[in-house]
Amino acid sequence: MTDENYPEHHLDYRPPLSAIDLGKVVYNGTYAEIYNYARDEYMRSIGYPYSKFLNEDKKNFAVIEMNVKFRKPLHYDEETVIVSKVEKIGTKSIVFDQKIYKENMQVLCNEAKFVMVCIGLSFKSEKIPEVLKNAFKNGPVK
C-alpha cells in the first residue's frame, strides 16, 4: 500500500429523522450508512462517481474491516461536517479515514476507519483502476 498525502473531502451533513433512535440521537448502526454516503460524495467530487465504478468498471468496494469510535452524540438536524480522506491505496485495497465534527469543526463526535477491497462481479479481489487511484491523488474536480 502506498502512503501519500491525499486531499480531504468535507461534506456538510444534517442527520435526518430516520437516523434517530429512541434516545433522540443518531442510532449507532446508522453511522456505517452515513460514512458510506460520505464516501459516495467523495468519489463524485473527484470526478469518479461510485455509479461509474459499479456500472462501467464492473467493480465494487467490499468492507472487510470497520473500526468506529463514538465520542459525542449527534442529534436530529444538527449541523455537522463529515471529513473523509484516503489513508492508503494498495493494489487491491483502500483505507478510508473518516470523522464527523460539529460546532464549526471544533468538536470531534465520531471517527471511523474502513478497510475495503476492490472486487469484481465474481466477488474475487481485483486491482483498483489506476485512473481511480489518480483521481483520489488529484482531489476534487473544480
Walk through the language-model features, giving the residues of each.
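Catalytic strand-loop segment that frames the active site of acyl-thioester-processing enzymes
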Residues: 1-45
